[in-house]
From Swiss-Prot:
Gene3D superfamilies in UniProt: 2.60.200.40, Probable inorganic polyphosphate/atp-NAD kinase, domain 1
Family: Belongs to the diacylglycerol/lipid kinase family. YegS lipid kinase subfamily.
InterPro entries noted in UniProt: ATP-NAD_kinase_N (IPR017438), Diacylglycerol/lipid_kinase (IPR005218), Diacylglycerol_kinase_cat_dom (IPR001206), Lip_kinase_YegS (IPR022433), Lipid_Phosphate_FormReg (IPR050187), NAD/diacylglycerol_kinase_sf (IPR016064), YegS/DAGK_C (IPR045540)
Cofactor(s) in the UniProt record: Mg(2+); Ca(2+)
GO molecular function, one term: lipid kinase activity
Binding of Mg(2+), residues: 215, 218, 220
Active site positions, chain numbering: 271 (proton acceptor)
Cofactor note: Binds 1 Mg(2+) ion per subunit. Ca(2+) may be able to substitute.
Protein name: Probable lipid kinase YegS
A cellular-component GO term for this protein: plasma membrane
EC number(s) on file: 2.7.1.-
Length: 299
């Protein structure tokens, strides 16, 4: 391990006092591995630290946090227009860690850290929304977005991904479907959507497999729509397989256009974006990411 190039870890401020992480980094440094550590405090820090990583000449920038941290770091990396672009390493430290979990990143800190530094760097896709923002994992709309956006931080901290489901059940009487129209390559649908998932990755909301067949290096986005007028019957019906379920609509395309007669909100790796018109397109091979050899998200 001692011959591997330098890395820079961008650590979410919520994990700054993580003692096991501090010990894992110390052990690797004792092996001769140079790991720079920078802690985020406010929005925009990740971009500044990626710029610093380039000046330092590191080969890997590690995102230490949840899906939001991974989104910030990966978005900063794909904005690099010239020179060598560092690879992305993943260190899952958030509440749900949906992208890292579905990619097969080890839960053990020391193993995840070693993979982030020394793992094979594979080209993976990202997605751009309305030419101004991006996501690496998934865009979710409807019921799922309102739940993940409104779930209290204390509940998430105490219960992790299960908190989203509990908060959703508590709010069930106020949740209504979104009327919208969705177009893609050889795809057109119009109706009432309770949940919309457009995935580069497979899961969101604390482990919910919204796009179970998505791959991150196939140049496509997977779409899944949960339809219906009433939430509770639709949720029960989704316990069946999608092949037998009239409340589930699936699609795949390099792009999707979404129009709604009223404002709807999409959650992009944890960041809300509201509007009536959305153009979502895949960015093939947008960056390199260090992944396990048996990563289920690779074709």
């Amino acid at each position: 391990m001692a011959n591997f190039p330098d890395s820079l870890l961008i650590l979410n401020g919520k994990s700054a006092d993580n003692q096991p992480l501090r010990e894992a980094i110390t052990l690797l440094r004792d092996e001769g591995i140079q790991i720079h550590v920078r802690v985020t405090w406010e929005k925009g820090d990740a971009q500044r630290y990626v710029d610093e990583a380039r000046r330092l000449g590191v080969e890997t920038v590690i995102a230490g946090g949840g899906d939001g941290t991974i989104n910030e770091v990966s978005t900063a990396l794909i904005q690099i227009r010239d020179g060598v672009v560092p690879a992305l390493g993943l260190l899952p430290l958030g509440t749900a860690n949906d992208f890292a979990t579905s990619a097969g990143i080890p839960e053990a800190l020391d193993k995840a850290l070693k993979l982030a530094i020394a793992g094979n760097a594979m080209e993976i896709d990202m997605a751009r929304v309305n030419d101004k923002t991006s996501f690496i994992n998934m865009a979710t709309g409807g019921f799922g977005t309102r739940i993940t956006t409104e779930t209290p931080e204390k509940l998430k901290a105490a219960l992790g991904g299960v908190s989203y489901l509990i908060h959703g059940l508590m709010r069930m009487d106020t949740l209504k479907p979104d009327r919208c129209e969705i177009r893609g390559e050889n795809f057109h649908w119009q109706g009432n959507a309770l949940v919309i998932g457009i995935g580069n990755g497979r899961q969101a909301g604390g482990g919910q497999q919204l796009c179970p067949t998505a791959l991150i290096n196939d140049g496509l986005l997977q779409l899944r729509i949960f339809t219906g007028e009433e939430l509770l019957p639709a949720l029960f019906s989704t316990l069946t397989q999608s092949d037998d379920n009239q409340n589930i609509i699936d699609g795949a395309s390099a792009w999707f256009d979404i129009h709604a007669p009223h404002e709807i909100t999409f959650n992009l790796d944890g960041e809300p974006l509201s509007g009536q018109e959305f153009h979502i397109e895949v960015l093939p091979g947008a960056l390199r990411c260090r992944l396990p050899p048996d990563c289920p998200l690779l074709r």
